[in-house]
A protein has these predicted regions:
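Cyclophilin-like peptidyl-prolyl cis-trans isomerases
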Residues: 1-197
Length: 197
């Protein structure tokens, strides 16, 4: 079942859907909306072709130029990602959160949300992005393998054993290729390709 709500703005209404697959976020958003929490708040962060962000209670009657984006209730919500079924595409509603470097559990803001404005791409651009994801996957796997062989690498370097280093590097590259084949190439789903083109 999908819950639909209307966000009334000075530019017109925005119809949003809340999904049962994300019950914590759905219930929180509904509760805040029913309490009037969002009434009078602004879309305080608008980035063309990216997203519009709202839900900061500090934006109510905020004077022009006030820094916004840190307000909210005194709680966060556990992550509820349902990827690849739901993903960032034009019109998607998502909970705002701080970055992974300071928020490794990927917890969401208790009230702030954003709507993906989105950008469309040419098929060739999506293919290039897939190639970039593939290269990133290869680099991450290689780095993990190299980390596992750190002491061996350091010993070979200390002993200036270039042949040994080259042999180890070749072995790590082959192991990387093997693991990449097992994992499969990163690729956009047909739904993502349709949404982004």
């Amino acid at each position: 079942m999908t819950t639909r709500l209307s966000i009334k703005t000075t530019e017109g209404d925005i119809i949003i859907r809340l999904y049962d697959e994300t019950p914590g976020h759905r219930d929180n958003f509904l509760r805040l909306a029913k309490e009037g929490y969002f009434n009078g708040t602004l879309f305080h962060r608008v980035i063309e072709d990216f997203m519009i962000q709202g839900g900061d209670p500090d934006s109510k009657n905020a004077p022009k130029g006030k820094m916004l984006g840190t307000g909210g209730p005194d709680y966060t919500l556990p992550a509820e990602f349902v990827y690849p079924r739901y993903f960032h595409k034009r019109g998607a509603l998502s909970a705002a959160r701080t970055g992974d470097d300071v928020n490794p559990d990927r917890e969401s803001s208790g009230s702030q949300f954003y709507i993906v404005w989105g950008k469309t791409y040419k098929p060739a651009e999506l293919k290039q992005m897939e190639r970039q994801m593939e290269l990133q996957q290869e680099q991450e796997i290689f780095n993990q393998l190299a980390k596992q062989h750190h002491e061996q690498i350091m010993d070979l370097r200390r002993n200036r054993n270039r042949a040994g280093l080259q042999e180890l590097q070749d072995n790590l590259i082959e192991e990387t290729k093997k693991l990449c084949r097992q994992n499969g190439k990163p690729a956009f789903t047909s739904e993502q390709t349709e949404a982004y083109t």
